[in-house]
Amino acid sequence: MNISPLAGHPAPAGMLLDVPALIAAYYDEVPDPAARLERVSFGTSGHRGSAFDRTFNEHHVLAISEAICRYRRTHSIDGPLFLGIDTHALSAPACATALEVLAAHGVNVMLAEHDEYTPTPAVSHAIVCYNRGRITGLADGIVMTPSHNPPADGGFKYNPPNGGGADTAVTSWIEASANELLERKLQGVQRIPHEQALRAPTTHRHDYLNAYVDDLASVVDLEAVSAAGLRIGVDPLGGAGVHYWPRIAERYRIDLTVVNDAVDPTFRFMTVDWDGRIRMDPSSRYAMQRLIGFKDDFDIAVACDTDHDRHGIVCRSAGLMPSNDYLAVSIHHLFRHRPEWRAELAVGKTVVSSALIDRVTGKLGRRLYEVPVGFKWFADGLARGELGFCGEESAGATFLRRNGETWTTDKDGIAAALLAAEITAREGRDPGEVYAALTRELGRPANGRVEAHASPAQKKILSALSPEQVKGDSLAGEKIQSIITRAPGNDAPIGGVKVSTETGWFAARPSGTEDIYKIYGESFGGREQLDRILAEAQTIVDAALALGAHAHEGSSR
């Protein structure tokens, strides 16, 4: 990974986004559905792109919105639709476009009061609360967000009635319908003028902020945080929760300071990320330089990304915690301090999250539920109240209410961040100190990731590998215990391969946007063993790709 010389430094003026030009491109540029990259494509968290690249333009939003209206009608979803936005420049225009289509279809849309920005967890919370106890007239939602992506990006995320990110069956349906509309030059898309849509009897206002904030004590022990008198620093990174934090401080009498309350679609206040781009990633030490500088001024400092579904934790003892480390600490704390949680509640993790989570879960006597990358895989289990905590290595997590009922079914950066304050208050030590104690008992993992070139054909082979195509008996001097291409928790394809030994593992997956594959690795045997795992992993994967290519050639003759 080549680190930019700008990484960790304030963004130079020449790097800042030309917002008027981006908005003009959103309306003026027309995507070509014959160009693969310009089609609608739902990844692990919705459709994302930039208006400059003709990958996120008004035509995309019109087509996706029409497709969602048809999906709702086909699947008898006729309750309100909760519609939120983050602070990216394209989010408000996309919201306006979507409303024109939704209102034309007579969908009851719940916009935020005062056109407030709306964190993803506030939308998920609204859907879950509305649908509780209902079997008909169910609500769903849309959030306009590209998550922590650079300022020029836009994103469109659909949350069905379970309140979480849509699964592949849903997104495939919407994607196919939307692309058909693009191919037909939007013929069949219903829309009405924006002012008419705002005045429509089906357009309503919803107080997302207070509905969410007033319910927070049901998921985090904020009374303990207040009683401990902790000093908490918060950097919203210019994101959708910027006005939520002062309300949280006031409502729960917490000594909480927002270190930067600026909202600016150029995100000029950010320090540059590792690759020389502006990115609002709370798990990146380069993007988090400002808050890391406040480490000794607060008992705990926290941040969230642009739609506030991801978290970053800065401790006096450890600085910025790696996301895997904090997930393990959160699980260790929650399952010991939630007496109303049922004994059969499981822990959810993705296949590339740390095996320390497995060890903590085993120590607690809980069941592990391991799924492919993507938080959407947890939504149904959270909705049914079967998963107590769910986390992914990219700093996303949520968990049940203190009474064991569903809180959100999508990632919640606010709750995860406040949990760090609860841990500090109730354990008498910050999450970094808890992690140090945990690893003294269970072992300290070393984590890493490398990338290797892969052609589109090789990426396709990697995503469809079978365990039998992966050859080898040992990895870094240890016997291989398992080779999987499907997740143990739900038997869904992981889109690659994971190989595990007693003290280490690697997982290889193709990139969705570049001609590379990524190898994630971990070792409880130290950095040297991790380096061996990553090196041998590339050899194993390259051999499997060659075998897969040979098999493909044989079958095509």
Please tell me what each predicted stretch does.
Residues P20, T74, F82-D153, R247-I313:
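N-terminal small/polar loop signature for handling phosphorylated ligands or for N-terminal nucleophile
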Residues N2-E38, R134-T136, A152-K295:
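Gly/Ser/Thr-enriched, mixed-charge loops and adjacent short helices
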Residues S65-L81, D221-A228, K295:
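Glycine-rich phosphate/diphosphate-binding loops that line cofactor/substrate pockets in enzymes
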Residues F298-I300, I313, H337-R557:
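Phosphate-binding and adjacent anionic-ligand microenvironments
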Residues S50-A51, P80-D86, M110, R231-V234, ...:
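Short glycine-rich or small-residue beta-strand-to-loop segments that form or flank ligand, phosphate
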